[in-house]
Each structure stands twice: as structure tokens, then as C-alpha cells.
Amino acid sequence: MQFVAHDNFHTLEVRKVRYLHSRQVTFLLAGLLLNIEQFVKAIKERNNEFKIDIFLRSLLYQLPLHLGDHVHDDVRKSLLVPEPELCAWFSLQTGYAPASTSGRVNLYVPGTKTSRRRIIQRSLASNFSEKFKRFPECLFVGFEHFQRFLSIWTRDAERRLFSGCREIPVGSHTLVELANLGELLRVMVASEQFHNSRLLSRLAVHCYKIYGEDGFIS
């Protein structure tokens, strides 16, 4: 597993050169996070024009997709499926939109925020229609009640789409929390305690500090 910083795009690329067990993947990612400050320092020494904020956003965008299943299950499973709406959520919150991707997992999202919001809107509307099928009685309680029901759903969708998709800030605090997360993941791998409630609570706290209070990723 290789971690490559691209000078042209100021981004991080994670290359998987061979099959690795899920614990190995988590252990290597933990090592990157644990040493992220040194990694960033080495990049800046090599290329002073390198934009670290973009690099960090590209890392934050990819991290949940690489870690998703591995953190919650010590049996080899497929990666968290990067469905379009999931990638759109991640992209809006991290402020990063990859134009292309390498490997078998496609992380591409449209470049504009409007396009990404439309993906999420379609997903929310699809979920609404599926749930609506289970409660058809909403159609038979009168127009006023249905209108009120639809208004509540619309306000909730708008709140999730705009208030819940604020772009998170990145900076020195991000490096500190990523290192803390890496240290915790190392402990979880070494002790094989992926289901320990205390450690999972600590993991949630680190995600909260990295991705924010309203973070969909958290």
C-alpha cells in the first residue's frame, strides 16, 4: 500500500499494489495518520508551493471510504460502497471533488456544488417515495394534512442539504486530530478490539473533532 502526494494536483493518492487483509489496511492507514505532521512537513520541504489544505481535504474525503468496513468488522469485507450520493455528501463537507480516481473504487463526483446537491436531492426524493409507499394512508386524510406533511419533509431535506453540508475547516488542528485518530486505530488493530465500546466511543469523538458537529461523515 502506497501513499503518494501529487505535486500537480496537491492531493493524496492511495495505491493498493497487492491484496491486504483488512487489519493490514487499517494498520497502514493508521501509520499514515500517526505520522501525518512529518509527512506534510516532508512534502513542504520538497515543494514549498504544495497546497497542504487541498491535500488534507483529499485525505479527509477518502478516509471514511477506505476505513469504513475495516473499523467495524475484523473479517475481510468489501469496502464501503461509494454510492454517488455518499460521495456527494463527503465532497460537500470536505470541500474536495476528485475529477478522476484510480483503482477499482470510483470516487468521482461532479465538480460543481450544485451538481452534487442535485445528486443528494434525487437520493432524498427517492428515499421519500419508497417510505411513502409504506404509508399510503397519508393520501386519504385530506389535502391540508398532506400539504403539511410534505412541507415538513421539504424543510427537513433543505436543512440536511444546506445546514448539514457546511464545508469543514482544515488546519493545524486537523493534523493533531488525524494523528490522534491514527494512534487509536493502531491500538484497535494491535489489541484486535474493533468492537470495544469504549474504543469506538473514542473513535466517534475523534471523527467529531475532525469532521465537525454537523458532519454527515461523523
Curated annotation (Swiss-Prot):
Pfam short name (any one): Luteo_PO
UniProt keyword annotation of Repressor present: no
Protein name per the record: Suppressor of silencing P0
Primary role: Suppressor of RNA-mediated gene silencing, also known as post-transcriptional gene silencing (PTGS), a mechanism of plant viral defense that limits the accumulation of viral RNAs. The P0 protein suppresses local PTGS using its F-box-like domain to mediate destabilization and degradation of the AGO1 protein.
Family from the record: Belongs to the polerovirus P0 protein family.
Known partners and oligomeric status: Interacts (via F-box-like domain) with host AGO1; this interaction targets AGO1 for degradation, and thereby suppresses the silencing function of the latter. Interacts (via F-box-like domain) with host ASK1 and ASK2 (SKP proteins); these interactions are essential for viral pathogenicity. Part of a SCF P0 complex composed of P0 and the host proteins SKP and CUL1.
Domain of life: Viruses
GO biological process assignments: symbiont-mediated suppression of host innate immune response; viral process
Organism: Beet western yellows virus (isolate GB1)
UniProt key word Nucleotide-binding: no
